[in-house]
């Protein structure tokens, strides 16, 4: 295969939420048989057809960087992890739909990846909000993915989906909820597959085709993160 242009997408979230299983499913179209904890960072690649079905269609490599660890790690660990955050073109934020804490921690993960000094714990502002204006120069596309959808009891699903909708609004990102052990959640033509393709197209456009900075939506165009949506039971 001829050499392809590539983009770098971080896959962030707490340990145990299913990032490795998700990346394996996205890149190999197979269920990961024996997932293990990621130490440091693991990278896998998938081929994506940008603007598929149009005259502008072009194949790109999508590098998916599965970053291990936790947001509560010591500063030395965060500093080491910061090397993975260089030259990022997109971020997939992954949380466990059965674990509200993993959803709350996505705010800290995003700040760690996007802050220049990699010390997000120092930029919490009043009323429990994170100030997006501190990242005004960033225009990194985000995608929110909730895992273990199959493990949510039927009588709890509406509450969980309401919570993820607030998350999606906070991050100004589309959301996908799935079960990483079931490839049908990402079947071709499904709404999830369309959202995923749209996200990768956006990442590629920002990296290769956007030249006018005024067209790049910054964090100042979006409202602040609001923890109320996550702390309410």
Swiss-Prot record:
Residues 1-233 are annotated as: Small GTPase-like. Keywords: GTP-binding, Nucleotide-binding. Pfam families: Roc. CDD domains: RabL3. One of its GO terms (biological process) is natural killer cell differentiation. GO terms for cellular component: endomembrane system. GO terms for molecular function: GTP binding; GTPase activity; protein homodimerization activity. GTP binds at residues 16-21, 148-150, 179-180. Required for KRAS signaling regulation and modulation of cell proliferation. Regulator of KRAS prenylation, and probably prenylation of other small GTPases. Required for lymphocyte development and function. Not required for myeloid cell development. Homodimer. Belongs to the small GTPase superfamily. Rab family. This is Rab-like protein 3. It comes from Danio rerio (Zebrafish).
